[in-house]
C-alpha cells in the first residue's frame, strides 16, 4: 500500500500556545478525513482569530487531548528542542496463520507537525547600567504581539496546506466501510530518546511501502 506523507510547515510557538495550536491542527486533519454521520462543531481559538472544526466525537477529542498532554510533559523535560508529532491513518488487516490471528496496521497517510518551542526570554541578571540587553515592558509587549501575529499567519498557512493536501491526494484513501465515522488513526510523539522515535517512524514506512512526499 502506498503511504502518502505531508510535512507541515514548522511553527515557532511558546509553551503556553502548544495546546491550542495542536488541537487546531490535529482536529482539522481528522475532520477532513472523517466519514459518515459526524456532528461538526466550530471552535474559536482563544489566542488567535481562527476558527476550526471538530468532528464532534468524544473519543476523538479525548484521544487528541491525551496525546497533547503527553507531548507538553515531554517538552517540559526537553526544553529548547525542535519537535515533531506524527498523525498516522491506517487500515487494520487480519492475517490468519494456523495457530493464531495476527492484526496488522497498514499505514496509508502520515502527517508530520513540526514545532520549534521557544523559551520565554528572561531579563539579564545584574544591575549594570552598561547593559543594553534590558528591554522595557512596552517594547517587550510589542515584540510579543508581533510574534503572535506572525504565528497566527503561519497557523493559517498550515490549515490551508492541510486542505490543499486533502483535496489533491485522494487516490490512496481506502474504500469506505459501512458504519465507520472516521478512519483509525494514531498520534506519535517523541519518546525519551529521539532515536527511538525516528526508528519507530522508519519501521512504519517499511511496513507501509515507500511514501510519497508533499511539502
Swiss-Prot record:
| Any Pfam family hit | ATG101
Q: Where is this region: Disordered?
A: 124-147
Q: Which UniProt keywords apply?
A: Autophagy, Cytoplasmic vesicle, Protein transport, Transport
Q: Which GO terms describe its biological process?
A: autophagy; protein transport
Location comes to:
Cytoplasmic vesicle, Autophagosome
Q: Look up the record and report any one GO term of the cellular component aspect.
A: cytoplasmic vesicle
The family classification in the record reads:
Belongs to the ATG101 family.
Q: What does this protein do?
A: Accessory protein involved in autophagy. Acts as a scaffold protein of the ATG1-ATG13 complex for faithful delivery of autophagic vesicles to the vacuole. Required for selective mitophagy.
What does the subunit comment say? Interacts with ATG11 and ATG13A.
Which protein, by its recorded name, is this? Autophagy-related protein 101
Name the source organism. Arabidopsis thaliana
